[in-house]
């Protein structure tokens, strides 16, 4: 059988059509961030936007601006930084063994002076699980949480997951404080262990005197009421707020003068293929499409540099996969053409479209949700680039309803989409037949005589027998084996890149704009955009 060329170096070692597992090793940190003290010529406050009509309950807040402020009012057990490493907050440790995660708590206090206990964590866990928030989405593997003692919580899982602890960034509130009312029957926001607390009139955040970082330079957060998206846009554009964050999920980017930092999101942009299609079921064709695309171009011109080019299936910012992912980021015409000719598409018709000996043409339709302008732009870039190799792609811009209907019915060839990967880096729903985001995926047929040729490899780190065994496993089987502890991330990455069930393009980033007088804005992440607020300083 002819040898298949692909663009990767194989090392042996829910669909979001529009967020961010724990490293159980020494890369995790429980150290408190450094604290800045206000100096002469600086101010001790920040001004931010909020919605007075919305709540500061982290499990019911509806607006993005209030949800982000909740990260200052309520601390989680742990956070992940912008490279998906764990930084412990209220937890001293989070140890995952098999189907159980044991969390040990630090000695910390709520803003009312009462001590944090395991019962508060269990209460918050149950709220998170039943909420309509990202926290419920992340905790899909968690079955229950119980208090072993006042400082220990045990979380039962439905399967083993070495990176489960990365999902434990749900806000911790004082047990029952979300249901208490005042003498007028008004329910106020719950009590947290955050860096700040609400003042009595609930229109300003002030220092929580029971927080270890209380001596930070920033003593209060002054709030401006922005009741709707139009008001938010206005205040951002005129610079009324010192900081503003957007995940750009709708494709619209607000501009604010000053500085900005990109926030890594675990949102994969990819091309999905209907593997029931005779042509697209050919691995060589999917490899050709992958190698023919310039991922840097898509990030630059499609997403205005608010994305990281994907060198594999997992987020390239994740330290654990930096040495095991190596899809080419720029287009490789030679490899693309070789792959196409290997499967018989070695002629061009009068329109420049590749055909095989039977007259079959490489003509496809690429579905895209027309309601997201960034994705539409990316789809057009993809079509233009592939046309250079004789692959004709018609971009079909559909309404969200029509787009999802086509995917659900299987009435498509190619589609451009975005999926939010949970912080435990679980991509099984995307690549496993029957998965919630696995449109067009089916278990590939194994051929005993099929071989692949890896290009660019200079050395082998596994025996030929081991490589053959890995290649005989499908990506879905390797995912299952990874959680069972029989396969490594290197194994999984290798087979994903060889099998190419979908074509990864890039991982989107959000953006945090901030006043150019603010210093030390470091390691802001989707887990906490104010990650380093204890070290902020603001010039006058």
What are these regions (language model features)?
Residues 48-96, 126:
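N-terminal lobe/hinge region of extracytoplasmic solute-binding protein
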């Amino acid at each position: 059988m002819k040898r298949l060329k692909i663009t990767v170096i194989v090392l042996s070692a829910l669909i979001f059509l529009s967020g961010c597992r724990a490293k159980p090793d020494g890369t995790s940190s429980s150290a408190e961030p450094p604290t800045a003290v206000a100096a002469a010529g600086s101010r001790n406050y920040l001004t931010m936007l909020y919605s007075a009509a919305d709540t500061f309950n982290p499990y019911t807040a509806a607006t993005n601006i209030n949800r982000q402020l909740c990260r200052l009012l309520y601390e989680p057990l742990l956070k992940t930084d912008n490279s998906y490493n764990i930084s412990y907050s209220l937890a001293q440790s989070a140890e995952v063994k098999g189907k159980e995660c044991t969390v040990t708590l630090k000695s910390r206090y709520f803003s009312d002076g009462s001590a944090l206990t395991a019962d508060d964590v269990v209460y918050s866990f149950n709220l998170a699980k039943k909420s309509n928030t990202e926290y419920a989405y992340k905790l899909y593997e968690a079955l229950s949480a119980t208090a072993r003692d006042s400082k220990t919580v045990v979380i039962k899982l439905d399967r083993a997951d070495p990176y489960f602890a990365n999902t434990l960034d749900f806000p911790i509130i004082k047990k029952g404080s979300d249901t208490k009312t005042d003498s007028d029957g008004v329910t106020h926001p719950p009590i947290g262990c955050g860096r700040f607390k609400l003042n009595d009139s609930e229109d300003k955040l002030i220092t929580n005197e029971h927080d270890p970082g209380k001596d930070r330079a920033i003593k209060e957060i002054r709030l401006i009421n922005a009741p709707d998206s139009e008001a938010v846009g206005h205040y951002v554009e005129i610079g009324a707020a010192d900081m503003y964050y957007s995940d750009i999920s709708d494709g619209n980017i607000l501009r604010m003068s000053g500085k900005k930092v990109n926030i890594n999101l675990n949102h994969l942009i990819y091309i999905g293929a209907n593997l029931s299609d005779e042509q697209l079921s050919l691995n060589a064709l999917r490899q050709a499409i992958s190698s023919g695309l310039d991922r840097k171009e898509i990030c630059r011109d499609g997403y205005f540099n608010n994305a990281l080019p994907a060198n594999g299936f997992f987020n390239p910012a994740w330290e654990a996969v930096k040495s095991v992912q190596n899809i080419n980021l720029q287009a490789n015409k030679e490899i693309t053409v070789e792959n196409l000719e290997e499967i018989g598409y070695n002629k061009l018709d009068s329109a420049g479209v590749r055909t095989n000996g039977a007259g079959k043409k490489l003509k496809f339709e690429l579905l895209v949700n027309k309601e997201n302008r960034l994705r539409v732009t990316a789809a057009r870039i993809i079509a233009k680039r592939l046309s250079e190799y004789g692959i004709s792609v018609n971009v079909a811009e559909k309404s969200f309803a029509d787009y999802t209907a086509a995917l659900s019915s299987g009435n498509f060839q190619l589609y451009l989409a975005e999926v939010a990967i949970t912080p435990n880096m679980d991509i099984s729903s995307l690549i496993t037949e029957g998965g919630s985001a696995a449109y067009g995926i089916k278990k590939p047929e194994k051929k005993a005589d099929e071989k692949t040729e890896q290009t660019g490899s200079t050395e082998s780190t596994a025996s030929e027998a081991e490589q053959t065994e890995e290649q005989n496993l499908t990506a879905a089987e390797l995912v299952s084996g990874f959680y069972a502890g029989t396969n490594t991330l290197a194994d999984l990455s290798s087979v994903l890149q060889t099998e190419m069930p979908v074509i990864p393009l890039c991982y989107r980033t959000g953006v945090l704009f901030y006043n150019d007088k603010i210093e030390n804005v470091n390691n802001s992440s989707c887990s906490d955009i104010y990650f380093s607020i204890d070290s902020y300083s603001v010039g006058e």
